[in-house]
């Protein structure tokens, strides 16, 4: 377990993994919410380096006019995730969830808790999305079932598609 508190930490970790000849099959980024905060300085610099952002004097990228900061945060997150994904064949992203309304209906679903469109875009690029919860028997379950409650869950690999995996049983 290695703790990173900045994008430069992540770059150093990736460099060390490359120098060690890629020893890991899996890398876990825990959490993506923390990564979203980490990339904000990078996103701010990316925005300032554009013609539209060259006169921006704010310190918070999300204060950029016309929502431009959100797309830069998304670009920065994608760049960091792409960097990490070159370090191992499998990257697991741990995300927090939020309750989201579906259109104008009274239906609420769980979705990835990231700003703007980032959660939806991240979902579309993922091979599998599971929702971790405790069932009625207090078992720890990772669900890849797409249903009316966990709409962003699902999996492209057939061995995970529409499956509930019990990770721990209550004794």
Residues of each region from the PLM?
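Basic, amphipathic N-terminal segments that precede the first structured/catalytic domain
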Residues: 1-26, 163, 168-171
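Conserved, well-folded catalytic cores of nucleic-acid-processing
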Residues: 16-20, 38, 94, 125, ...
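Structured loop/turn residues at beta-strand edges in well-structured enzyme cores
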Residues: 22, 87, 124
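Conserved acidic residues
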Residues: 25, 89-90, 127
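P-loop NTPase motor core
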Residues: 32-121
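Conserved GTP-binding G-domain of TRAFAC-class P-loop NTPases and closely related GTPase folds
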Residues: 83, 98-171
